[in-house]
């Protein structure tokens, strides 16, 4: 009884016109997308509350328009037409009916609906307030079958459930004239659930064919094609298609991070980022590849992985036609054509194509190396460098060459190695036309043309074109020899020197001549040997035109023209010094009588405590004449 009194009082005190807001076509056109969406949500919510209280809702056409995402204003010539798609072709009546199911006193929270009074006999039993809210969200309470909610009260032609917004799409009243004549929606002859009917009212994009079930969603999507970005950030001027994107972006300026991980305390400015981060702790990988079974934490990584199986490369460079699987790779490549270097270092003025390169460069000024290896304590500027380094400790080499079986610890190393088999040399010098297999070699070669030597020694000021050369040179100042042979204890300043030295102990000769099968320990020896077969003599004397197969042979030959010999002696058995008569080491070892040195002493001291075995160059003393 109390509920009935409350309902009667609500019907008297509140009407739909009291809470409704209407716009003309011109006023509606001045609203932006966010304001229109807010208006639709508020109007539908108010209507739902009035229906739950049993109040009549006469503006059926307005509500139906809002349900389908359409404009709330109507043309006069449309007032005589049917409001809902299911009513086409039906005769109009003037029987006043309302969509105002009253609250039943016996409704159970578990979904058991007891029979009660109903204003409209064809709409049947009403839902409780919780049930209406669930309908507004587009779903029903668990355990309740939509067909079982009001048994015996529904017309077989209309289930009366309403649309996803919780308002019956067959509201039953439509204003057709100033005299407030209405027609009745007594039944829906379509025989379909209005939820299904709403899905069939699809709005299709004329540009790409994408389909939406709401008109305002289509309007938002069309901005992608038109390029309209009406929402502008007041801080940096960046524009966005959606207001939600602007709100998310604004947190970058405010520094706000409201979503905090309960496990590690890390905070994020978006809830989706927190959800993705929490999968690290839970180990959840919901995205699984059907081809190889590999699972991923993030959907974006899963999509990129799938392109490896399909071979899809979605991003095509309009300048050179090169295609890329990933958008970041495409953007990095495109800067090569534009020549743009928008990121400048405030310390030294150096400019970079990419922001990440600038960030890495800035760490050279600060000396910061935030990534530390847990095994050996070595620190790195970049996380990628740490990952590359860590494979040294694990010894893992998962990338194997199918041609020769050689394995590598990084995919990039395998790709570079495979060019040896294919003979591919994609990097061509525009100056001389020389081609290279590796990009790093190509960059070093270009410095030969430009004369650039960006790596300078802080000790002596000597500059180098290659960073590795600087590292090798610096060991001269430090005297450090970190690479020690475990067999004999000999130490080396370079890793390559130790590797070559180890071949002496192992007897390994990996460099084999394809002509005669002779093997060598070092690649340089193989190169020298190969000249024997080719007959090539690239080193030519500029004086007489004689050619040699080795540079050392040319150097020796040129001394005949200059008259200079590299070794100077005061006397045999004493250290060599400059400024005295010079002889070649070859002649000295052969024991040729050539010496013509100004000295008062014999070439070999007469008094010596050394044995003959300690004097490898001792021989009969020649007569020395004065100059």
UniProtKB/Swiss-Prot annotation:
Protein family membership:
Belongs to the krueppel C2H2-type zinc-finger protein family.
SMART domains linked: KRAB, ZnF_C2H2
Question: Where in the sequence is Phosphoserine found?
Answer: 80
Organism lineage: Eukaryota, Metazoa, Chordata, Craniata, Vertebrata
Question: What residues does the KRAB domain cover?
Answer: 14-85
Instruction: Tell me the protein's name.
Output: Zinc finger protein 264
Q: Give me any GO biological process, just one.
A: regulation of transcription by RNA polymerase II
Q: In which tissues is it expressed?
A: Relatively highly expressed in kidney, thymus, testis, ovary, brain, lung, placenta, and prostate, and relatively low expression in heart, liver, skeletal muscle, pancreas, spleen, and small intestine.
Cite the record's Polar residues compositional bias ranges. Answer: 107-124
Q: Which domain of life is it from?
A: Eukaryota
Sequence positions bearing Phosphotyrosine: 343, 511
Q: What positions does the cross-link Glycyl lysine isopeptide (Lys-Gly) (interchain with G-Cter in SUMO2) connect?
A: 425
Q: Does the keyword Zinc-finger apply?
A: yes
Q: Which intervals hold the zinc fingers (C2H2-type)?
A: 203-225, 231-253, 259-281, 287-309, 315-337, 343-365, 371-393, 399-421, 427-449, 455-477, 483-505, 511-533, 539-561
Q: Show the ranges annotated as biased composition (Basic and acidic residues).
A: 74-93, 136-151
**Residue stretches spanning the membrane:** none
Species per Swiss-Prot/TrEMBL record: Homo sapiens
- Name a GO CC annotation attached to this entry: nucleus
Q: Where in the cell is it found?
A: Nucleus
Q: Which InterPro entries match?
A: KRAB, KRAB_dom_sf, Znf_C2H2-type, Znf_C2H2_sf, Znf_C2H2_type
Q: What keywords are annotated for this sequence in UniProt?
A: DNA-binding, Isopeptide bond, Metal-binding, Nucleus, Phosphoprotein, Repeat, Transcription, Transcription regulation, Ubl conjugation, Zinc, Zinc-finger
Q: What does this protein do?
A: May be involved in transcriptional regulation.
Q: Which GO terms describe its molecular function?
A: DNA-binding transcription factor activity, RNA polymerase II-specific; RNA polymerase II cis-regulatory region sequence-specific DNA binding; zinc ion binding
UniProt-annotated stretches for the region Disordered: 74-155, 174-194, 605-627
């Amino acid at each position: 009884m109390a509920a009935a009194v409350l309902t009667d009082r609500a019907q008297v005190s509140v009407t739909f016109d009291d809470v409704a807001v209407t716009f003309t076509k011109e006023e509606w056109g001045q609203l932006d997308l966010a304001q229109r969406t807010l208006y639709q949500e508020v109007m539908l919510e108010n209507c739902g509350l009035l229906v739950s209280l049993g109040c009549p809702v006469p503006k059926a056409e307005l509500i139906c328009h809002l349900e389908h995402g359409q404009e709330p204003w109507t043309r006069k010539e449309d007032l005589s037409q049917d409001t809902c798609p299911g009513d086409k072709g039906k005769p109009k009546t003037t029987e006043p009916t309302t969509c105002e199911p009253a609250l039943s006193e016996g409704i159970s929270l578990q979904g058991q609906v007891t029979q009660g009074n109903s204003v409209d006999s064809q709409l049947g039993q009403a839902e409780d307030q919780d049930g209406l809210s669930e309908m507004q969200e587009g779903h029903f309470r668990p355990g309740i079958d939509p067909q079982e909610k009001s048994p015996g009260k529904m017309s077989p032609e209309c289930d009366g459930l309403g649309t996803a917004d919780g308002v019956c799409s067959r509201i039953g009243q439509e204003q057709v004239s100033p005299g407030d004549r209405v027609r009745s929606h007594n039944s829906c002859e379509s025989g379909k659930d209005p939820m299904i009917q709403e899905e069939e009212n699809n709005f299709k994009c004329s540009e790409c064919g994408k389909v939406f079930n709401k008109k305002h969603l289509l309007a938002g999507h069309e901005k992608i094609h038109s390029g309209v970005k009406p929402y502008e950030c007041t801080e940096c001027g960046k524009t966005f298609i959606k207001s939600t994107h602007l709100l998310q972006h604004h947190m970058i300026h405010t520094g706000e991070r409201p979503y905090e991980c309960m496990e590690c305390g890390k905070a994020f400015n978006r809830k989706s980022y927190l959800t993705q981060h929490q999968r690290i702790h839970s180990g959840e990988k919901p995205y699984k590849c059907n081809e190889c079974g590999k699972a991923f934490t993030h959907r974006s990584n899963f999509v990129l992985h799938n392109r490896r199986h399909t071979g899809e490369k979605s991003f095509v460079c309009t300048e050179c036609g090169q295609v890329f699987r990933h958008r970041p790779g495409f953007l990095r490549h495109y800067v090569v054509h534009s020549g743009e270097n928008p990121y400048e270092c405030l310390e030294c003025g150096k400019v970079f194509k990419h922001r990440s390169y600038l960030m890495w460069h800035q760490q050279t000024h600060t000396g910061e190396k935030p990534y530390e290896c847990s095994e050996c304590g070595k620190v790195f500027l970049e996380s990628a460098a740490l990952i590359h380094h860590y494979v040294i400790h694990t010894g893992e080499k998962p990338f194997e060459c199918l041609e020769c079986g050689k394995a590598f610890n990084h995919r990039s190393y395998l790709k570079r190695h495979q060019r040896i088999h294919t003979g591919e040399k994609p990097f061509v010098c525009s100056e001389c036309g020389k081609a290279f297999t590796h990009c790093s070699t190509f960059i070093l070669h270009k410095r030969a043309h430009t004369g650039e030597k960006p790596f300078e020694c802080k000790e002596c000021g000597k500059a180098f074109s290659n960073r590795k050369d600087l590292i090798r040179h610096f060991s001269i100042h430090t005297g450090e020899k970190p690479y020690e042979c475990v067999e004999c204890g000999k130490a080396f300043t370079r890793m390559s020197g130790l590797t070559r030295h180890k071949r002496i102990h192992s007897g390994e000769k990996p460099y084999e001549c394809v002509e005669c099968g002779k093997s060598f320990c070092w690649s340089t020896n193989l190169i020298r040997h190969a000249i024997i077969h080719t007959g090539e003599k690239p080193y030519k004397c500029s004086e007489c035109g004689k050619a040699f197969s080795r540079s050392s042979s040319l150097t020796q030959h040129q001394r005949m023209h200059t008259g200079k010999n590299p070794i100077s002696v005061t006397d045999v058995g004493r250290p060599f010094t400059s400024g005295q008569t010079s002889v070649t080491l070859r002649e000295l070892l052969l024991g040729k009588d050539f010496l013509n040195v100004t000295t008062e002493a014999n070439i070999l001291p007469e008094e010596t405590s050394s044995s003959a075995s300690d004097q490898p160059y001792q021989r009969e003393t020649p007569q020395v004449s004065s100059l």
